[in-house]
Amino acid sequence: MLPLDGRTVLVTRPAHQAGSLAQKVFEAGGEAFVFPALGIEPVALDELADALAYLAGADIVIFVSPNAAQYGLAAIRARGTLPDAGRFFAVGPGTARALAAQGLEGAVTPDGQDSEALLALPELQAVAGQRVVIVRGVGGRPLMSDTLRARGADVHFMECYRRTCPPADPSRLLARWRAGGIDAVTIASAETLYNLARLLGEPGAPLLAATPLFAPHEKIAEAARRFGIARVITTPGGDDGLLDGLVNWFRNKTGSKT
């Protein structure tokens, strides 16, 4: 018997990223119900002209997510150039893999999967006078830029994609959920949770609140608890971390009944 036999997991990642987690759930014996609650749109190249010009002379370039790697490198290859002497950093192994898949090998990656872990790296302590470009989505967290500026760095952003709430019809999902057919919800950001709640509307609010929710970071888990989700489980980062959290939770849940 596989660990997720008989379980259906709601996968809310953007459509172009949902397949990996859905496949992992399937391989563990479960069923993935894919309902993207976050959309990703590239920023127009003309809007990135200033950032691309600054990037060419940067000392440090930080990619904060797989989307930053995908859309950032696409924009750079279309209209810009990577700095010859720059050092490259990636938040989390998923971002490093996304960079490597597009030919940018050797990005420095912390053991942890968040900005705090990256900022703890020895290479980012003495950055006074360094030119830093943070490649991210529009409106990301200020922690990284604030911290690096406090350390004396000259920080600029290259905001290469926007997060959106995708149009979606929740009727099929709601019908399945009402019939007891959704056993767990996975989210990768607080924004995804808010979008999901908006898409489900009032009919889905009690279903969402009562279903175990798995989040790959304590900050996301805290946001879910404040939102009113009754059972929130924090997992390690990435798809592998979410899967481990799902497997361990349902294994313990099943074991407690025997």
What is the predicted function of each stretch?
Residues 1-258:
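Signature of uroporphyrinogen-III synthase
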